[in-house]
Amino acid sequence: MDDVVSVQEETVTAMPDFDHSRLQIISPAECLRLMRSVPLGQLVYTYGGLPAVRLVNFLVDDDTIVFDSGPGDKLRAAERGDVVAFETDVVDAERHLGWTVTAVGHLSVVTADEAAALRRTLPLHSWLPMDDPHLVRLGIESVNGRRLVPWGQRPRSGV
């Protein structure tokens, strides 16, 4: 994870333009912009000692990701403050282009008062019907991304 960059870093001078696989490295600011451009992401967390991946609709609010959760394993992970990953992507399989962004951080449950305030300002609406939704926050502690670019734009040899 030596190429993971903290969200708070303003400039990145040591990071190469391409990684060893000749994928273009996306800056932290661009990662957040790309995450804001899609409505769905994959929450990756531990459930019963094993990795679990759940599709959720979400919003990026500053350096946090927020989403609704009903009672269950995602909410319990937030109540424990688990470290999780959150992945978003767009892929054009026909043209072999696309990008992926992964954010890592701790989950938390948003208090009822703060959730009410956020719901007034953010256009967050769960895609699933929920009787008792809880607003969950992922505080982004690191973010990294890669872009698959056309062959002509990639370096000819490894970096």
Spans of features found by a protein language model:
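Short secondary-structure boundary/capping segments
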Residues: 57, 75-76, 126-128
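Short, surface-exposed beta-strand-loop junctions and turns on beta-sheet-rich folds
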Residues: 73-75, 152
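Short, basic/aromatic recognition patches
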Residues: 17-42
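Short, acidic/turn-prone active-site loops that include or flank metal/cofactor-
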Residues: 71-73, 90-91
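Amphipathic coiled-coil/heptad-repeat helices and related helical stalk/stem segments
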Residues: 27-28, 71, 120
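Short beta-strand segments
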Residues: 38-70, 86
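Charged, gly/pro-rich active-site loop segments
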Residues: 2-23, 85, 90-159
